[in-house]
């Protein structure tokens, strides 16, 4: 109220936000809205995210428009310890009937957390069953709002846990928790058949080496 929306006839939603389309455009092609007034998220970082789409669409919409992408919107609750998340959690996955697997890594095992007296919390990752694609992540612990960024990037750009595991993380840092969570997922999906074949191969090689050493010992000098 008080911004002239009533006079212009621009509708508002039940949540009392300005009604916009996927391009953040109101019923008037030259009026856009973003941030808290547009919703659906009341976050400063989401407002900044929307501002890019609103600005670009307002300036260049006659050539091409971009729908606002909400596929990887993160948020954090700055309690003690912090709680941060992005994507689906288990409750949402069940409500939407989305199949998922859960991998959990306890931050109490992390060297940096132990050294700083912050050895509590966890990293919980939801993935597509049998694949490393990230569906959502929840982190509880010190600096959770900082740690979640790696997973935001992973979800936004289609990076799986294998890539995170293969990325060098500085030791000792809290960020290693992300790598170790990916490592926990990898261990749960290790190729059992291949490992058994490798075990047999090395056992055979050890036996072969032992036989060769025995023959060399028996040969006259």
Which residues are covered by each model-predicted region?
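Flexible, glycine-rich terminal cap/loop adjacent to redox cofactors
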Residues: 73, 78-89, 94-221
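FAD-site-proximal beta/loop scaffold in flavoenzymes
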Residues: 1-64, 150, 165
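Rossmann-like dinucleotide-binding cores of NAD(P)H-dependent redox enzymes
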Residues: 41-48, 56-92
């Amino acid at each position: 109220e008080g911004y002239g929306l009533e006079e212009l006839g621009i509708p508002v939603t039940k949540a009392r936000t300005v009604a916009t389309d996927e391009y953040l455009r109101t019923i008037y092609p030259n009026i856009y809205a973003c941030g808290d007034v547009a919703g659906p998220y009341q976050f400063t970082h989401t407002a900044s995210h929307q501002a890019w789409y609103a600005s670009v669409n307002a300036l260049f919409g006659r050539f091409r428009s971009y729908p606002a992408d909400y596929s990887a919107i993160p948020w954090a609750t700055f309690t003690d310890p912090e709680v941060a998340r992005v994507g689906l959690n288990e409750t949402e996955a069940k409500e939407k009937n989305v199949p998922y697997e859960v991998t959990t890594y306890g931050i109490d095992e992390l060297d940096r957390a132990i050294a700083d007296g912050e050895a509590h919390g966890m990293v919980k990752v939801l993935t597509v069953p049998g694949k490393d694609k990230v569906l959502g992540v929840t982190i509880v612990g010190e600096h959770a709002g900082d740690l979640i960024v790696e997973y935001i990037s992973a979800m936004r750009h289609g990076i799986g846990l294998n890539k995170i595991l293969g990325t060098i993380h500085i030791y000792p840092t809290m960020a290693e928790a992300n790598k170790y969570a990916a490592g926990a997922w990898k261990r749960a999906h290790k190729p059992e058949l291949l490992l058994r074949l490798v075990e047999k191969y090395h056992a055979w090689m050890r036996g072969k080496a032992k036989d060769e050493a025995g023959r060399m010992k028996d040969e006259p000098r």
